[in-house]
């Protein structure tokens, strides 16, 4: 069986990368951008950095800002209608996963009118046409949505997140500019950074992992582990390293899938609006313990990538514990809570467990699981 790997056509990396947006847009014959960016990024002038480049090059644009954290079906549908009226011929997504996921959904629906709304795109969608061309500019170091074939939209009425997978939605160009991430507060830097680490670790041990994805994931674990503390301290070196590390993780997990850390985090975002990275960070060590028997020697390599010394002389039990302890220590150092006590209500656990089991990420978990086992994992975290 062949392994597919889908990446951007082009990506730019490094401080000042956004200056090349106009060159790319003009070179591709684009005329008017539909710019997806959330209200806070507009308010604090982050979006303006990109708009200034467009205006300086004489490129037309329209801004769409009806985007919430954990974007909803309504955010997508109003975006589709706004795009139709705008006369735009391409999309620019500026932000974290929320802006990019909204833009991906809009682009796919516009290009595939047979799919009336995002609900019909849940799972692995059988679309025929590539998305409206999308240029992605991340402002967080975590989701890697600029290089993935996935997007996640919240169904508010049913309190659930829909995971949509479509290789036709990947941005054609990504601009990974650490200067666009420098305004992130410490808490957001920590949460998105732990999200990136979760991508790397889950992608490394997922059932679909193979040699090429393993290369990306181990390198991402190494980069993120050495740089997240510095990024939280807002050093330029830390920001640059995290921008790269989260992108490398995205290159991997987008092509092989994730596991039940994400399955368990998704309903927390849908029900409580919990920040995705915080949920992942809290759940990750507990699920690593649960998954350990199904991971062979991979935790030895995780521990090594996280800077643990002497792993070659450790027993299996020792290196597995060392890897999990290293994850817990990093999460603690960047200020992530240790449990879900302040988030989860015990009476909601049956709903959460069933939602997690039904989640599209669950089949990728290296260890077979059940609703009952996921229930116990949630209970252990409160």
Over which residues does each language-model region extend?
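N-terminal small/polar loop signature for handling phosphorylated ligands or for N-terminal nucleophile
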Residues: 42-115, 229-239
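Glycine/threonine-rich beta-strand-loop-alpha-helix active-site module
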Residues: 74-179
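Carboxylate- and glycine-rich phosphate/diphosphate-binding segment that chelates Mg2+/Mn2+
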Residues: 150-256
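Catalytic phosphate/nucleotide-handling subdomain of diverse soluble enzymes
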Residues: 267-306
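Short glycine/serine/threonine-rich phosphate/pyrophosphate-binding segments
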Residues: 18-21, 43-46, 73-76, 99-103, ...
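C-terminal charged capping/lid subdomain of soluble metabolic enzymes
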Residues: 299, 309-382
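An N-terminal, well-structured beta->alpha segment
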Residues: 1-64, 381
């Amino acid at each position: 069986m062949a392994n597919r790997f889908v990446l951007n056509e082009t990506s730019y990396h490094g401080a000042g990368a956004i200056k090349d947006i106009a060159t790319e847009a003009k070179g591709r014959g684009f005329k008017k951008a539909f710019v997806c960016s959330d209200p806070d990024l507009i308010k604090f002038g982050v979006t303006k950095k990109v708009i200034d480049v467009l205006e300086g090059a004489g490129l037309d644009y329209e801004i769409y800002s009806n985007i919430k954290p954990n974007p909803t079906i309504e955010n997508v549908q109003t975006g589709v209608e706004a795009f139709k009226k705008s006369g735009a011929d391409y999309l620019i997504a500026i932000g974290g996963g929320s802006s990019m996921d909204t833009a991906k959904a809009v682009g796919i629906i516009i290009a595939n009118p047979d799919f009336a709304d995002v609900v019909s795109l849940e799972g692995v969608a059988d679309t025929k046409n590539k998305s409206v061309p999308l240029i992605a500019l991340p402002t967080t170091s975590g989701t890697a949505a600029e290089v993935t074939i996935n997007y996640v939209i919240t169904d508010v009425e049913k309190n659930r997140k829909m995971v949509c997978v479509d290789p036709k939605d990947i941005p054609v160009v990504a601009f990974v500019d650490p200067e666009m991430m420098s305004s992130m507060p410490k808490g957001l830097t920590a949460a998105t950074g732990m999200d990136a680490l979760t991508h790397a670790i889950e992608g490394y041990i997922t059932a679909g992992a193979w040699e090429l994805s393993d290369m990306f994931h181990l390198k991402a674990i190494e980069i993120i582990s050495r740089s997240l503390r510095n990024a939280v301290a807002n050093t330029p070196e830390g920001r640059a390293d995290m921008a790269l590390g989260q992108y490398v993780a995205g290159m991997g997990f987008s092509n092989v899938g994730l596991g039940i850390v994400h399955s368990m985090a998704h309903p927390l975002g849908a029900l409580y609006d919990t920040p995705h990275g915080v949920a992942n960070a809290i759940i990750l060590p507990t699920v690593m313990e649960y998954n350990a028997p199904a991971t062979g020697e991979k935790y030895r390599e995780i521990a090594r990538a996280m800077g643990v010394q002497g792993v070659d002389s450790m027993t299996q039990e020792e290196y597995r514990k060392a890897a999990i302890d290293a994850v817990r220590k990093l999460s603690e150092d960047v200020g992530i809570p240790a449990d879900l006590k302040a988030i989860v209500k015990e009476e909601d656990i049956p709903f959460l467990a069933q939602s997690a089991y039904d989640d599209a990420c669950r089949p990728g978990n290296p260890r077979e699981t059940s609703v009952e086992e996921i229930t116990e994992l949630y209970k252990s975290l409160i």
